[in-house]
Regions:
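Hydrophobic alpha-helical transmembrane segments of multi-pass inner membrane proteins, especially
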Residues: 1-197, 236-296, 321, 325, ...
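Glycine/serine-rich anion-binding loops at beta->alpha junctions
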Residues: 85-92, 131-133, 212, 216, ...
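Active-site phosphate/pyrophosphate-handling residues
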Residues: 97, 233, 315
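Transmembrane helix boundary and interhelical junction motifs in multipass membrane proteins
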Residues: 134-139, 214-218, 229-231, 248, ...
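TM-adjacent membrane-interface loops and short helices in multi-pass inner/ER membrane proteins
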Residues: 190-231, 235, 244-246
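A juxtamembrane structural motif centered on a specific transmembrane helix
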Residues: 290-342
């Protein structure tokens, strides 16, 4: 039900913004739905998933390196690659393989040597994303790894060290990358350059304020004034035309999905499956936070999409796969409980 509500909202807004994009999104959604129906059966019947950590790790690094070297540049960041006229964003799919890699490594061992090796590979993922200037994805990967490490080891020193290194890396990124400074400055005082670097943020705030609690109604607002509104700023369009109450409902639905992920994670007995559910849940909620936080000026804009709502084939396909994996873990746990009862 939650997924259907988010998808319906997406199609309503995309139809409003661009019918062509809405049709493309629908076609990709159908393909994603078919793939998602297969995933739970694969997870329930395939025990080899926990035996190939380096397949997950090396494939993920290879895809990110390809984007870093020959990827298409969008708003200062290298995000996608084009093959046969189609463009896709590998980092959306590497988020899933990354969680599988970390879960598999920590399932094997949580001794310091293995933690150090896993941390090195995880850091390589994050570093490549930083070099590609895809800082939103880098932050998602980083937080997912630190929290998965803590769940696997229950070591508070790892958690403190990870968060501390993250803060230091954020300050370093601010000094090294000009587009990071632009985003931070636009967040701090967008009104000082309302026609330049603060334009996107201020237009989003205008849209949210204009919509009020109940919205202006479909086709009554001006969401197209916001650059790339169909992607990382679609929450502003929802607030403007459907209202703040509706937008809050979308936020609560996203939080409800996250809580379901966490409930499934706590019920899984095997550490491998527990870490997968937890890691995917963290990635999902961090992405929601970055998107909505950036639109509402709570944090600097990071350029990530709102899962299942924003336009983007890679985004919707990877999110469907993520939900399919979680559903597979739920089916696995249910089957285990039925076997115990018998």
């Amino acid at each position: 039900n939650n997924t259907c509500m988010l998808l319906c909202t997406s199609f309503i807004m995309l139809t409003r913004i661009s019918m062509d994009k809405a049709v493309r999104q629908f076609i990709i959604m159908v393909v994603a739905a078919v793939i998602t129906m297969i995933i739970p059966y694969v997870i329930d019947r395939t025990w080899q998933l926990a035996k190939i950590p380096w397949v997950y790790g090396l494939i993920g690094l290879a895809l990110l390196l390809v984007v870093c070297v020959i990827g298409n540049t969008s708003f200062g960041a290298q995000l996608s690659i084009s093959i046969g006229g189609f463009s896709f964003q590998p980092s959306e799919f590497v988020k899933i393989s990354f969680v599988f890699f970390v879960a598999t490594m920590f399932y094997r061992s949580t001794e310091f040597k293995n933690v150090a090796i896993t941390t090195g590979v995880a850091a390589a993922h994050v570093l490549i994303l930083v070099l590609s200037k895809d800082l939103g994805s880098a932050l998602i990967f980083f937080l997912a790894y630190v929290l998965m490490l803590f769940i696997a080891t229950s070591n508070w020193l790892y958690l403190a060290g990870g968060l501390g290194s993250g803060c230091a890396a954020a300050m370093l990124a601010y000094k090294l990358f000009s587009h990071v400074r632009v985003r931070v400055e636009a967040w701090q005082d967008p009104w000082s350059d309302i026609a330049g670097k603060g334009y996107q943020v201020t237009q989003a705030l205008f849209a949210i304020g204009t919509g009020g609690w109940f919205g202006m109604g479909l086709y009554q607002g001006m969401p197209k004034k916001i650059p790339v509104v169909e992607k990382d700023f679609i929450f502003a369009a929802i607030s403007e035309e459907l209202g703040g109450i509706y937008a809050l409902c979308i936020l609560l639905i996203c939080l409800g999905c996250f809580m379901q992920f966490m409930l499934i994670a706590t019920r899984m007995q095997a550490l491998f499956y527990k870490l997968i559910a937890f890691g995917l849940g963290i990635e999902y909620v961090v992405q929601v936070f970055l998107t909505i936080g950036g639109v509402t000026k709570f944090i600097p804009s990071t350029g990530v999409t709102l899962p299942l709502v924003s336009y983007g084939g890679s985004s919707i396909l990877s999110t469907f796969i993520l939900f399919g994996v979680i559903q597979g873990l739920y089916v696995l746990k249910r089957n285990e409980e039925e076997e115990e009862e018998q």
